[in-house]
Amino acid sequence: MTAAFAIGYDWLYDVWTTDQKSQIMSSMITYGLDLGVAAYGADPTFTGWWKNATEGNWNCVCNSGLTMGALAILGDDTSGTASQLLGLTIDNAKQNCAMAVSSDGSWSETANYWYFGTTGHAEMSASLISATGSDYGLLNANPVFNLTGMFHMYITGPTSLFNYGDHGPNKYSTTANSMLYYAEQYNIPRYALFQRDQRDAPEPWSMFWYNPTISGAFWDDQPLDHFFDDALDQWGSMRSSWTDINALYVAMKAGKLQGHQTHNDLDSGDFVLDALGTRWAGELGSGDYRSTGYFSSDAQDSLRWLYYRKRTEGQNAIIVAGQNQLVTAAPTIQHGTTGESQGSSTVYNVPGNSAAYFTANLASAYGNV
């Protein structure tokens, strides 16, 4: 809400009356920025849990909204709240939000929360650049953040995303237009070429972040298969075409079962399968977030694992003796591909000898049976 007020205050600044500006600014400070300062410790009775070791969407969204609000009123705020807050949010976002991207580019929560997190990250850095001329190191605080667009490309199948964890079928919490922004900031035009034709592209940020001078096809010389090796995530994406809605697509994961901001499932070995325009093996997605203990913890005895959609039996994964996988699982993986890439044409027939594989040793997930 603070972000929305910030945009309205800034973009319509020349038409607001003095009283209107004062009222809007007062509301932003009282119901947004003051609470942000309290969350950072000014009020010891206020708990801002999202600021501490929260490498994910909450940190990105909260810091982004507070930063946008502070920047919008910085020149008018005589209370000092805006400048005080900027001294807190930027460094915190660099230490937390930016670190949600793993060493291989994966978003460490889930494919769905990539949307929330990267939108917050992009809005925050874009606002800093627009208002001050600098992002203060946010874009490069994590040296591999630029790889996260690749994560989004490969986790997108012909019918839907590889929607593991807390993520319902086609549940888009916002758009992927951060891809347009990252294409410019990281000089990776392929990200914008991928996003510009997606169904979620027509929304306001595309007007500001899309560079209409880019040309080409995102799939031109883009490998069909890609593997993400960070031990936290460990997953692979394999397909027969980038442009055929009837293409074969298989995505499979191993990875650790803790450290995903309590948005993961007990799902080492989980997979999805698309073919002939249909998802034949899919995901159940999120449960009811209001359910008792749903976000209690990712410990072995967590109430979260009592819910069918979160426990092992609710996944496309192996069940042994009816037991959940161990949260301490540390799978090892092997993978390979013959390395085909699609050319510039939308018509592509994968060679008959094309092959890709992803295997995982899941023994550590079943040490309890």
Model-derived features: positions:
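Aromatic-lined, polymer-binding surfaces characteristic
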Residues: 1-156
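Generic secondary-structure boundary/loop-capping signal
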Residues: 9, 104, 161, 315-317
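Short, charged N-terminal helix-start/capping segments
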Residues: 20-58, 190-202, 280-289, 293-312
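Carbohydrate-active enzyme catalytic cores, enriched for enzymes
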Residues: 49, 73, 113-279, 346-351, ...
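Generic structural "secondary-structure junction" signal
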Residues: 109, 164-166, 320
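Catalytic core of carbohydrate-active enzymes
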Residues: 250-347
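Long, amphipathic alpha-helical stalk/connector segments used for oligomerization, subunit docking
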Residues: 336-369
